[in-house]
A protein has these predicted regions:
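Alpha-helix-loop-beta-strand connector modules within alpha/beta enzyme cores
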Residues: 93-94, 115-132, 205-229
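Conserved, mostly hydrophobic/aromatic
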Residues: 57, 127, 176, 183, ...
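Active-site-proximal loop/short-helix segments
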Residues: 72-74, 81, 135-157, 186-211
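Active-site-proximal, glycine-rich beta->alpha crossover segments in alpha/beta enzymes
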Residues: 81-179
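A short glycine-rich, hydrophobically flanked beta-strand micro-motif that places a catalytic Asp/Glu
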Residues: 188-197, 230-241
Length: 301
């Protein structure tokens, strides 16, 4: 019971109470200055983004270089516009491009030659070329949808039109998987899938299992097929929700005591071919010392 409580506590820490998901990695003006780049370029220019990620990794003694610094990389391809708040300088999607899910056209294949996604892939290549291990975070189906329409519309569809959510979710999951495969080809060493927009605690257990969990499991399976030899780490909000809904089973994998979480991910990813899907941890903890010497291997049901 204590172990279960800890898992759920971690999931709540990683989840967001706001309408939009939290930033993937926090980047600051100071980090950009140390990297010799402009703050704005950390979001839109590949080499600048890579230099910022490297500076952040060096400052935090993080064994991983984590990308990107914006949650709108995938959603931008379907109409979301990233803006930097004039006062806080925090990147956000200010206005939703659609009012309803029904207004959205089909999700066409991503164009890897333009926008933020092009810059991210360029950054991955640059970091790989310089000998760094890159963790790339993929936004989950529901997080992307909530940047295109309001979260209220997404939840409304989950309750009232689950068939539409499953259909649009399958389309979007395939696009996410294509992005994952391209990122690995560019040099990403670890993938992370984050979807804190939908929480197990905000819908009924049956609805989560039959709709949200089904959509998420489908997306995870597609990503795994696109990058079968690369570790995929699920954020705690997602992995704990799947386990509670009986969509996945978690198993402790012992690691050397005293490791940073990022070190453990690297070692398990290199040495355990049977452990390519993990969860119950958060990629933002990469530079932090693990309290318990375990990685949680996940098996989807």
């Amino acid at each position: 019971m204590a172990e279960e409580t800890e898992k759920f506590h971690i999931a709540r820490e990683c989840a967001s109470d706001s309408d939009a998901p939290p930033p993937t990695c926090i980047i600051s003006e100071d980090i950009c200055e140390a990297a010799g780049i402009r703050y704005e370029d950390a979001f839109f220019d590949g080499e600048a983004m890579a230099r910022a990620a490297l500076a952040l990794s060096r400052r935090d003694h993080d064994p991983l270089c984590r990308l990107p610094f914006s949650v709108s990389v995938e959603a931008e391809q379907y109409g979301a516009k990233l803006t930097l708040n004039e006062k806080t300088r925090i990147p956000a999607v200010k206005n939703f491009p659609y009012k309803r899910l029904q207004d959205m056209p089909a999700f066409q294949p991503l164009d890897f030659t333009k926008g933020q996604i092009s810059a991210v892939l360029e950054a991955v290549k640059w970091l790989k070329h310089h000998g760094e291990t890159v963790l790339l975070e993929l936004e989950g189906v529901f997080s992307i949808l909530s940047l295109l329409v309001s979260s209220r519309e997404v939840y409304k569809a989950v309750y009232r039109n689950p068939g539409e959510i499953k259909q649009r979710g399958a389309e979007l999951a395939e696009r996410i998987a294509e992005y994952a495969g391209e990122a690995v080809c560019c040099g990403a060493g670890i993938l992370s899938y984050s979807d804190a927009t939908i929480s197990f605690e905000l819908v009924s257990p049956e609805l989560y299992r039959d709709v949200c969990g089904e959509v998420t499991v489908d997306a995870v399976r597609r990503v795994r097929r696109a990058a079968p030899h690369t570790m995929l780490q699920l954020c705690s909000a997602t992995s704990v929700g799947l386990e509670r809904a009986d969509c996945a089973v978690a198993e402790k994998v012992p690691v050397t005591p005293g490791l940073l979480y990022g070190e453990a991910l690297k070692l398990v990813g290199l040495n355990r071919k049977d452990c390519r899907l993990v969860g119950h941890g958060c990629q933002v903890r990469s530079p932090l010392r693990m309290q318990e010497p375990y990685i949680y291997k996940l098996t989807l049901r």
